[in-house]
């Protein structure tokens, strides 16, 4: 219901037209729930994967939950946890989560990925290298 109303506004038409060409687009002034609704509508119209950049992991998690509620498959790409000193017991949960999101992106199972700015600045393996070293059971 809300998507139909949103798609008839001139602002939606303008941002949808700007996404027709390659490159980034920025949006300011909407509350988080409004942004999630707009992004979900744009993703459904364009069929492109959304990359939503947030200030931190908490915001990314909240945004991914909002997008899931609106019918998209979304995940959070967490930042890498650096260990600069020897530690007795270090978990690899964040590494596994990062690999899981990369695998879902490479496999086409995600409509959106929410990325904290810190994670966006960290290196990842190139897609062809990732797929070459992936084993599906």
Cite the ranges covered by each PLM segment:
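ASCE RecA-like P-loop NTPase motor cores
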Residues: 1-137
């Amino acid at each position: 219901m809300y998507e139909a109303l949103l798609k008839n506004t001139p602002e939606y038409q303008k941002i949808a037209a700007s996404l027709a060409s390659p490159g980034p687009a920025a949006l300011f002034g909407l509350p988080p729930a409004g942004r999630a609704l707009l992004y979900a509508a744009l993703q459904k119209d364009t069929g492109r994967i959304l990359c939503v950049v947030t200030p931190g992991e908490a915001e990314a998690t909240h945004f991914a939950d909002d997008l899931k509620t609106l019918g998209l498959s979304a995940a959070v790409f967490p930042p890498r946890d650096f260990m600069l000193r020897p530690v007795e017991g270090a978990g690899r949960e964040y590494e596994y989560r990062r690999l899981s999101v990369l695998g879902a992106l490479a496999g086409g199972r995600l409509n959106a990925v929410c990325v904290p700015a810190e994670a966006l600045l960290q290196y990842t393996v190139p897609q062809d290298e990732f797929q070459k070293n992936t084993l599906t059971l």
